[in-house]
A protein has these predicted regions:
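ATP/NTP-dependent adenylation/nucleotidyl-transfer catalytic domains that generate, transfer
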Residues: 1-31, 45, 53-56, 63-64, ...
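Short, surface-exposed alpha-helical segments at coil->helix boundaries
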Residues: 39-43, 66-73
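Internal glycine-rich, Lys/Arg-flanked active-site/core loops of soluble domains
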Residues: 133
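Primarily recognizes the serine-hydrolase "nucleophile elbow" in alpha/beta-hydrolase
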Residues: 48
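Acceptor/aglycone-binding surface of glycosyltransferases and processive sugar-polymer synthases
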Residues: 100
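Conserved G/P- and acidic residue-centered "switch" motifs that form tight phosphate/ATP-binding loops
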Residues: 36
Length: 334
């Protein structure tokens, strides 16, 4: 399985976070807790690295599901961290009304805007995400100031860049950035994250409909291609399925030059079509990937390059963990 030694991985992440804070001369940290697996793992790591009393953890609901709030409470209790619970729904609604008033006053066609937003829930979803970031910063300052840690993992951040640039992407570090979603799940089991969080469907909960809006369904709707996460058995901590996003990451690692663009790795040249590319990178099918996956990956990577933030440290690299024998790039044979 990709994580060969979960205890060593926990030690590595805890010590690296602790060293980063020590070098910066900053004792405290702030984390936005969503009730999902990534923020749960980060909260457990921060509590171990810095001590529970040095972590400002915030759950900001914007007409969010009760299930996500319950899960946030569960992991805060498990980590021994006090959880700040805020309801930003009224503020969110007020901003929407004021924005519509401003469009109307400026002479825009508000009927068009209403119709457009009815067909694209991500418009309001982007405000939900970006509204939480300044609130998190404010809570951070109110509690004495600290490092604002992110929760992005490799499957979301590497080439999909499945995050909001001014929202969940507006952080100081991403200590999970080198780990796949499956590896984050394995880390969660080892950290004793509550099972309810490990088995919950990954969702950004940005549309106000709970798990009806989940990561995989949004990716499928946007691309027409089944981009999926890996799953693990919480009892054995072993993979029960390998997601196509993780497969793509390991396929990219298998290519000769991992520092060039994904387009050059997959296609050899920007103008090359999918059929030719599939021949060039023919062993993609050995990773369970299709021509459609290659075409979709190129489209996603092209359209999200503006989000990339190379200055946001991941506090280490995947290669360092590979060299230490803590993880492996070899996918489970299922």
């Amino acid at each position: 399985m990709p994580v060969l030694n979960t205890d060593a991985l926990i030690t590595n992440r805890v010590e690296t976070i602790r060293r980063y804070h020590s070098d910066a001369g900053i004792a405290r940290a702030e984390l936005d807790v969503s009730g999902g697996i990534d923020s749960a793992v980060m909260l457990m790591l921060l509590a171990q690295a810095l001590g529970p009393d040095n972590v400002t953890a915030a759950y900001s609901s914007i007409n969010s599901s009760t299930e996500s709030r319950d899960r946030a409470r569960l992991v805060a209790k498990a980590a021994g961290v006090k959880l700040l619970e805020l309801e930003l729904g009224d503020i969110f609604e007020a901003i929407g009304l004021e924005a519509m008033r401003a469009f109307g006053a400026a002479g825009f066609d508000t009927d068009f805007i209403v119709k457009f937003m009815e067909g694209d829930a991500s418009v309001d979803g982007s405000l939900r995400s970006t509204l939480r970031a300044p609130v998190g910063r404010y809570l951070n300052r109110m509690s004495g100031g600290g490092i604002r840690h992110g929760t992005g993992n490799e499957c979301e951040d590497r080439w999909l860049r499945f995050y909001q640039k001014g929202g969940d992407g507006e952080v100081d570090t991403n200590p999970l950035a080198m780990l796949s979603k499956g590896e984050v799940y394995q880390l969660a089991v080892a950290l004793k994250v509550p099972t309810e969080i490990i088995t919950a469907l990954p969702t950004p909960d940005l549309w106000g409909v709970g798990e009806e809006h989940n990561d995989e369904s949004e990716l499928l709707k946007s691309s027409g291609v089944p981009w999926t996460y890996s799953r693990i058995n919480p009892d054995t901590n072993e993979y029960i399925s390998v997601g196509t996003i993780e497969r793509m990451s390991r396929f990219l690692d298998s290519q000769a030059d991992s520092v060039t663009t994904i387009e050059m790795l997959l296609f050899g040249a920007p103008g090359r079509d999918e059929d030719v590319a599939f021949g060039v990178s023919g062993h993609a099918k050995e990773f369970g990937l299709t021509r459609e996956h290659l075409a979709s990956a190129r489209k996603w990577e092209r359209s999200t390059r503006h989000k990339e933030n190379p200055n946001c440290p991941s506090l280490g690299s995947r290669q360092e963990l590979l060299d230490a024998g803590i993880i492996t790039n070899e996918l489970p044979a299922l």
